[in-house]
Amino acid sequence: MIINIVEILIFLVCVLFSVAYLTVAERKTLAYMQRRLGPNFVGYYGLLQAFADAVKLLLKEIVLPKESNYIILVISPLITLITALIGWVVIPLGPGITLGELNLGILFSLAIGSLGVFGSLLSGWSSNSKYSLLGSIRSTAQLISYELILTSIFIIIIMFVSSLNITTIIETQRVVWYCIPLLPLLLIFFIASVAETARPPFDLTESESELVAGYFTEYSGSPFVFFFLAEYSNIILISAFNGYLLLGGYLSFNYSYLFNILFNDYSYVSFLFEGLINSSAYAIKLVFLMFSFIWVRAAFPRFTYDNLINFCWIILLPLLFGIFLIIPSTLYIFDSFPTLI
């Protein structure tokens, strides 16, 4: 029991540190793309800027609107943050290295991810602000729409694997990553990920020119920090899912021939060598996917809300349904259905 609690605390600290340095990386990358310096005073090369910002926000006064529902207004950011952190339970960092090895890991992640919408919806309603309410309505419609896209992609991948266990999905990609036969899904998954996390150019829930700051307009101090942590935690989490489902997760390309050259048998040295390669492959994929979020923010203008919703229901969803029909037909023709189906 004590060991499990320690593991959870270590995992949470690692996630929160990753969130902190993702914000620094985003600001430095955007500054480089826009030919300016960015944060460079707090710590070496600005590496401690995230902690300075966190202290500043935590020390600010929590101001609540007079006519708001105080209890729900304070609880809503916690709902968003907790659902973002619980999603990490089923994420494997390596073979057998996970907080909770669930046979229904995909279903669990979808269920927990869909609960995050309640935080934004309740925060907008309880703020007693028209800007916040409109932002929460936009957020709800956007998250529900693109949640359907992500669910469809999960179902297509489950057709290949015949399992809802994330580790099993990763291990079936030892021969070839699914992004190679399912290349269009990689692009669709990334687009849906950007929309699901409400990141630019799909940040219509908090468009400054229309809604001030969306559903967290009335937040300040620590409740605002919770929304901030939840947003960037979701970016890392959904990037991890993208890497696990389509990019082989912690697997690199087939390197078994290196073992035959370097080691005569499967010794502890070869085991450590494999762990080093797997962890490096996982880190490279995750950094690449998170950098893609930052690059899209700098490169593309914001969509209008009607274009965002129409893009989901008129373009992406019919395209996925077409893929949904093609893949089972192809598997049936070549008699390649998974044996468990």
UniProtKB/Swiss-Prot annotation:
InterPro entries: NADH_UbQ_OxRdtase_su1/FPO, NADH_UbQ_OxRdtase_su1_CS
Subcellular location: Mitochondrion inner membrane
EC number: 7.1.1.2
Membrane-spanning ranges: 2-22, 39-59, 71-91, 104-124, 141-161, 175-195, 212-230, 243-263, 276-296, 308-328
One cellular-component annotation, GO: mitochondrial inner membrane
A GO molecular-function descriptor: NADH dehydrogenase (ubiquinone) activity
Entry keywords, A to Z: Electron transport, Membrane, Mitochondrion, Mitochondrion inner membrane, NAD, Respiratory chain, Translocase, Transmembrane, Transmembrane helix, Transport, Ubiquinone
Membrane topology: Multi-pass membrane protein
Enzyme class: translocase
Catalysed reactions listed for this entry: a ubiquinone + NADH + 5 H(+)(in) = a ubiquinol + NAD(+) + 4 H(+)(out)
Coiled-coil segments: none
GO biological process: aerobic respiration
Subunit structure: Complex I is composed of 37 different subunits.
Protein family per UniProt: Belongs to the complex I subunit 1 family.
Stated role: Core subunit of the mitochondrial membrane respiratory chain NADH dehydrogenase (Complex I) that is believed to belong to the minimal assembly required for catalysis. Complex I functions in the transfer of electrons from NADH to the respiratory chain. The immediate electron acceptor for the enzyme is believed to be ubiquinone.
Name the record gives this protein: NADH-ubiquinone oxidoreductase chain 1
Organism: Yarrowia lipolytica (strain CLIB 122 / E 150)
Name of encoding gene: ND1
